[in-house]
């Protein structure tokens, strides 16, 4: 879950140039090609085809890899500066909005100015018939005297029935968005994302378009028979993909925002998985569960560190499990990352050697086994992952009273918030020393 809103996102499928036409034909046939933006050529020579992210599923990606273009690279990325297509350049939504608002304002005897034009929104999020405007628009005092008719004009220009304007996330601990409803009688909206329905009130809850790559990845995991604990469930961003697509047997969903809990309960019902989920309302640090989880999701940024102790507590004592740890990592050249605090796409991986470290707290020896790391990863991501792994190993020993093995499986990029701030996810395998690694795992020795 996220602490801040973000601008509209253009998601693209990346592949090699020789497969571009096959990909385009398939995406057009499936009505997945984003016709408002141009196909982009990336710095490494790969080609990025803009897609309609809300309709794209992991099944589509698998079909591209296996049937449409066998042997092709098929990954998702976000285009930071997408170029409009020729069709879109006829007249953009922003241009239409500017023309309509200017005409309406001048009809009321108001002189149009460059300052007013600069105060119009340049980005927004569409939620069905509701448009959520960015916080940095309509700030001039003059607009106040033109309400509420102004909002009807704006809504008409954007082709919606309701309008809302966002502000910064409130520092209230529940990640409540500061959103004002400008036009309409309620803020409830619905999204269809990878075959999952999400309903929520935009004035009380948040929805992250930028997390689509991670939601698709979670949906593709094989969790059959597993019990999962989602420590920051929100409206079900990851809880629902784990249940609907990954096949988790049961999910314990923790959330302390009462408005998000209302939405989560509703979303579980409308997606037909309410019988496989228990909601734990309140502070997850006080969670009474223990020795139950095969997998724990810690989807909070900028850091989920406060949830690490309870994540260790809920892991099964006999065989352990996997932690999915979200984190914002600062990547400054020549500087060390600031742990509790890319647009690159994951490509090939290579194994890392086994490393044995001695616990400096006197808890004995902890075995850390290196898994795989993306060749696109920044070194700061890996250093943060190693630091997190060491801390988790120590926590596991403290919580369970015996040493555990920890192993970095992957470090996944989700998105970039700024040139030097990346949202990543660490997949960390945790096993008590008395249990064996899952069959097929090769523990490399130095």
Swiss-Prot record:
<dbReference type="GO" id="GO:0006400">
    <property type="term" value="P:tRNA modification"/>
</dbReference>
<dbReference type="InterPro" id="IPR029063">
    <property type="entry name" value="SAM-dependent_MTases_sf"/>
</dbReference>
<feature type="binding site">
    <location>
        <begin position="283"/>
        <end position="284"/>
    </location>
    <ligand>
        <name>S-adenosyl-L-methionine</name>
    </ligand>
</feature>
<dbReference type="Pfam" id="PF02475">
    <property type="entry name" value="TRM5-TYW2_MTfase"/>
</dbReference>
<comment type="function">
    <text>S-adenosyl-L-methionine-dependent transferase that acts as a component of the wybutosine biosynthesis pathway. Wybutosine is a hyper modified guanosine with a tricyclic base found at the 3'-position adjacent to the anticodon of eukaryotic phenylalanine tRNA.</text>
</comment>
<dbReference type="InterPro" id="IPR056745">
    <property type="entry name" value="TYW2_N"/>
</dbReference>
<dbReference type="GO" id="GO:0102522">
    <property type="term" value="F:tRNA 4-demethylwyosine alpha-amino-alpha-carboxypropyltransferase activity"/>
</dbReference>
<feature type="binding site">
    <location>
        <position position="208"/>
    </location>
    <ligand>
        <name>S-adenosyl-L-methionine</name>
    </ligand>
</feature>
<keyword id="KW-0808">Transferase</keyword>
<dbReference type="Pfam" id="PF25132">
    <property type="entry name" value="TYW2_N"/>
</dbReference>
<protein>
    <recommendedName>
        <fullName>tRNA wybutosine-synthesizing protein 2 homolog</fullName>
        <ecNumber>2.5.1.114</ecNumber>
    </recommendedName>
</protein>
<dbReference type="Pfam" id="PF25133">
    <property type="entry name" value="TYW2_N_2"/>
</dbReference>
<keyword id="KW-0949">S-adenosyl-L-methionine</keyword>
<dbReference type="InterPro" id="IPR056744">
    <property type="entry name" value="TRM5/TYW2-like_N"/>
</dbReference>
<feature type="binding site">
    <location>
        <position position="255"/>
    </location>
    <ligand>
        <name>S-adenosyl-L-methionine</name>
    </ligand>
</feature>
<dbReference type="InterPro" id="IPR056743">
    <property type="entry name" value="TRM5-TYW2-like_MTfase"/>
</dbReference>
<keyword id="KW-0819">tRNA processing</keyword>
<comment type="similarity">
    <text>Belongs to the class I-like SAM-binding methyltransferase superfamily. TRM5/TYW2 family.</text>
</comment>
<feature type="binding site">
    <location>
        <position position="215"/>
    </location>
    <ligand>
        <name>S-adenosyl-L-methionine</name>
    </ligand>
</feature>
<dbReference type="InterPro" id="IPR030382">
    <property type="entry name" value="MeTrfase_TRM5/TYW2"/>
</dbReference>
<comment type="pathway">
    <text>tRNA modification; wybutosine-tRNA(Phe) biosynthesis.</text>
</comment>
């Amino acid at each position: 879950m996220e602490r801040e809103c973000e601008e509209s996102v253009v998601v693209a499928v990346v592949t090699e140039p020789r497969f571009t036409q096959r990909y385009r034909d398939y995406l057009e046939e499936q009505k997945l090609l984003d016709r408002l933006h141009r196909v982009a050529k990336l710095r490494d020579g790969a080609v990025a085809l803009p897609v309609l992210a809300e309709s794209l599923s992991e099944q589509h990606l698998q079909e591209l890899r296996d049937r449409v273009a066998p042997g092709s690279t098929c990954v998702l990325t976000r285009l930071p500066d997408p170029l409009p297509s020729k069709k879109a350049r006829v007249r953009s939504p922003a241009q239409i909005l500017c023309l309509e608002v200017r005409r309406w304002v001048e009809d009321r005897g108001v002189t149009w100015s460059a300052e007013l034009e600069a105060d119009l929104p340049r980005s927004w999020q569409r939620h069905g018939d509701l448009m959520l405007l960015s916080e940095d628009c309509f700030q001039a005092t003059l607009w106040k005297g033109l309400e509420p008719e102004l909002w009807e004009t704006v809504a008409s220009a954007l082709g919606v029935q309701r309008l809302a304007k966002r502000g910064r996330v409130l520092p209230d601990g529940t990640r409540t968005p500061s959103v004002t409803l400008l036009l309409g009688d309620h803020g409830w909206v619905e999204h269809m994302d990878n075959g999952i329905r999400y309903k929520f009130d935009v004035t009380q809850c948040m929805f992250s378009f930028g997390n689509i790559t991670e939601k698709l990845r979670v949906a593709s995991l094989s969790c059959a028979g597993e019990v999962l604990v989602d420590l920051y469930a929100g409206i079900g961003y990851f809880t629902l993909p784990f249940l609907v697509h990954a096949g988790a047997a049961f999910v314990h969903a923790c959330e302390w925002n009462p408005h998000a809990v209302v939405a989560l309960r509703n979303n579980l019902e409308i997606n037909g998985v309410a019988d496989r989920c228990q909601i734990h309302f309140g502070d997850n640090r006080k969670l009474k569960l223990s020795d139950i989880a095969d997998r724990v999701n810690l989807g909070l940024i900028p850091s989920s560190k406060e949830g690490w102790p309870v994540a260790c507590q809920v892991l099964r004592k006999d065989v352990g499990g996997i932690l999915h740890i979200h984190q914002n990592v600062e990547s400054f050249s020549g500087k060390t990352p600031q742990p509790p605090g890319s647009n690159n796409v994951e490509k090939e991986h290579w194994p890392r050697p086994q490393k044995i470290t001695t616990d400096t707290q006197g808890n004995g020896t902890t075995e850390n086994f290196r898994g795989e790391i993306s060749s696109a990863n920044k070194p700061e991501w890996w250093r943060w992952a190693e630091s997190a792994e060491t801390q988790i190993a120590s926590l596991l020993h403290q919580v369970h009273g015996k040493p555990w093995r920890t192993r970095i499986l992957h470090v996944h990029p989700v998105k970039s918030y700024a040139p030097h701030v990346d949202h990543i996810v660490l997949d960390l395998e945790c096993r008590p020393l008395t249990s064996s690694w899952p069959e097929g795992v090769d523990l490399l020795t130095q």
